[in-house]
Design a protein with these regions (language model features):
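N-terminal subdomain of nucleotide-sugar transferases
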Residues: 1-62, 248
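Donor nucleotide-sugar binding/catalytic pocket of nucleotide-sugar-dependent glycosyltransferases
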Residues: 62, 157-160, 168-211
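Acceptor-binding helix/loop patch of EC 2.4 sugar-transfer enzymes
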Residues: 72-85, 130-165
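Acidic donor-binding loop of glycosyltransferase active sites
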Residues: 175, 290-307, 318-321
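Conserved catalytic-core segment of nucleotide-activated headgroup transferases in glycan assembly
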Residues: 201-211, 216-294
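Short hydrophobic beta-strand element within catalytic cores of glycosyltransferases
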Residues: 311-314, 321-325
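Conserved acidic donor-binding segment of nucleotide-sugar-dependent glycosyltransferases
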Residues: 340-347, 355-361
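A short, well-ordered alpha-helix in the C-terminal region of glycosyltransferases
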Residues: 355, 362-377, 386-389
Length: 402
């Protein structure tokens, strides 16, 4: 098949969840299909990644979008038009004209739009379109707004309402909408009942899977939280770990360390000697893997909605037991006390940490069960095959509709 894939980021290096997802899909889809990639970029040095991506793509087109989102032009456009800020700051005239030219020149089988907010670049066309929602964006932003001081909320909430309107609008424009979980699929169905939907889950990178499950140090445990701290949910989780979980743990344990790692981790301030902040460069996959390999537990106090968490899938693939909130594991086909331990407040997190460290059988069961599930359900080879079938269904559905 000839696939036109449009992404709001350059999918290399695999620094964010979206980039990890797209790169792994490209890796496997390119074996049987011709992929024409159109990606938005902010900084000129991102163009150097074209060389790496060439092996997966028939053509690559990088299109400039605003380097700094908070430009006066963007702010005024978001305030005085019907478009939400997310669409405004991700819009590129270059991408719009590039896609228009590609559609004239190449006979595509399907257009793959990764996120709804790149859909404005795609003109009216007879080519069937698959819109992939990595998360329900307006719900993510609503969660953020709900945490703001009450006197600020009304001003920002207007943008959330616009976001919801346009997200729903582009769901209706697509031939089929795919989500990363059944949970998000049901949320879309609640909003617009007659939308055609499918589920294309996230996965764990091939490099994260251990060949054998290793014994971990439970005597002097290392508790890891890893994420990209550009995202609000990860900052929220880091602060909860330091301010809520850590003081409770210190009352119960002595020899332990908390590692908070990721891009922009340096934004996190703490003077507690038990917390180690580790900055990870965007292309340093080896450091990420080593942290997963050398930690004892992965703690994920995530309270923001949407998507599925690649960080949790990576921990499962690495044989690292996970303690997370109910929200954190939403959309994943995993069970409490079988694949992970669920904790929804600071007391429960401490309780589950102590339980996992003191019960060797439970610890090993969590390792083995989550690893086997990741291997079976959350590997990118199988996921890409599911996506190929969805492409065929999109094409068939469009033919029947016409």
């Amino acid at each position: 098949m000839k696939i036109l894939m449009v992404t709001p980021y350059v999918p290399y290096p695999p620094a964010s969840g979206g980039q990890i997802r797209t790169l792994n899909l490209l890796k496997y889809l390119s074996r049987k299909n011709d992929i024409y990639l159109v990606s938005l970029y902010k900084h000129e040095d991102e163009k150097r990644h074209i060389e790496f991506l060439t092996k997966y793509c028939k053509e690559i087109h990088l299109c400039k979008r605003p380097e700094k989102p908070w430009q006066l032009k963007n702010i005024l456009t978001a305030i005085f038009t019907s478009k939400p800020f997310l669409i405004v700051r991700n819009f590129s005239e270059d991408a719009k004209s590039t896609i228009k030219d590609l559609l004239k020149r190449v006979q595509f089988d399907v257009i793959h739009s990764e996120t709804f907010y790149v859909m404005p670049h795609i003109p009216k066309t007879h080519v069937p379109t698959l819109l992939v929602e990595q998360t329900i964006e307006y719900k993510v932003y609503k969660h953020f707004v709900d945490g703001l001081p009450f006197f600020i909320r009304p001003f920002i909430f207007i943008d959330v309402l616009k976001l919801r309107h346009w997200e729903r609008y582009y769901w209706n424009q697509a031939t089929l909408v795919a989500t990363v979980s059944n949970h998000d699929k049901e949320l879309i169905k609640e909003e617009v009942s007659d939308i055609n939907t499918a589920v294309i889950p996230n996965g764990a990178g091939d490099e994260m899977f251990e060949k054998t499950i290793k014994h971990r140090n439970t005597i002097d445990p290392v508790l890891l939280f890893l994420g990209n701290f550009f995202w609000l949910q990860n900052m929220e989780a880091a602060q909860f770990t330091i301010k809520k979980i850590l003081p409770q743990l210190e009352k119960k344990m002595q020899n332990f360390k908390i590692v908070i790692a990721g891009q922009q981790a340096k934004k996190i301030n703490t003077t507690n000697s038990k917390v180690q902040i580790v900055e990870i460069e965007e292309d340093n996959a080896d450091k990420v893997k080593k942290l997963y390999q050398t930690s004892t537990l992965f703690i994920a106090p995530i309270f923001g909605p949407g998507g599925t968490r690649l960080k949790i899938l990576a921990a499962m693939a690495a044989g690292l037991p996970v303690i997370s909130t109910s929200v954190g594991i939403e959309g994943l086909n995993i069970k409490d006390n079988q694949h992970v331990l669920v904790a929804n407040n600071k007391e429960q997190f401490v309780e589950k940490v102590l339980l996992a460290l003191s019960n060797q059988k439970l610890y090993q069961d969590l390792q083995n069960n989550s690893y086997e599930l990741a291997l079976k359900k959350y590997n990118w080879k199988n996921i890409s095959e599911e996506l190929e079938q969805v492409y065929k269904n999109v094409k068939k559905h469009d033919e029947n509709r016409n």
